[in-house]
Amino acid sequence: FNNAYLASENDMLKEALDFSVQTGFIQDFSIVAKVILDQKSPFLKSLLINKGTKNDIEKGMTVFSKDYLVGTVIETNYLTSRVLLLTDLNSKLPIVIEGTDVNAILEGTGNKLNLKLSYLPENYKIEANKIIFTSGKDGFLTPGIAVAKSYLNDKQKIFIKLLSDPDQALIVNVTNGQINK
């Protein structure tokens, strides 16, 4: 049993180390960390990771699980850091919608299956199956990082769902948000 767990964790770590190569992130600014506490609350969503200022983690750095953005470092200590997830009510991310020049803000709702788009142009209706990317207008993240997708539910209503599942994050990559193009 213990060997199977270690083998599984080893595979996750290898995948995390390949992250910078797969996504184009600069290796010097990609730090692998383990999630040590998942703050469960209906609306407040955060993770505690096992890397801090000792490992050059800084407030404002971006956090990825697998290949997808899950949040931002909001607090650092010597050995740990707190990550605000995109699903948190306090999370607001400037985005652009695939195939358009429409900018908006992706807001957390506490529900990973239905985030909110704010500040859309008047009378704009988002279509289903559109990828939502970072716009870069926050000055931290490079534009073009895929974050979420629009879906049509059973009631023919559009909802926004993250491409990642922050609740499943065990190993994460912490970066400065810049892509090596």
Question: Could you tell me what each predicted segment is?
Answer:
Residues 4-5, 12, 16-181:
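A secondary-structure micro-motif
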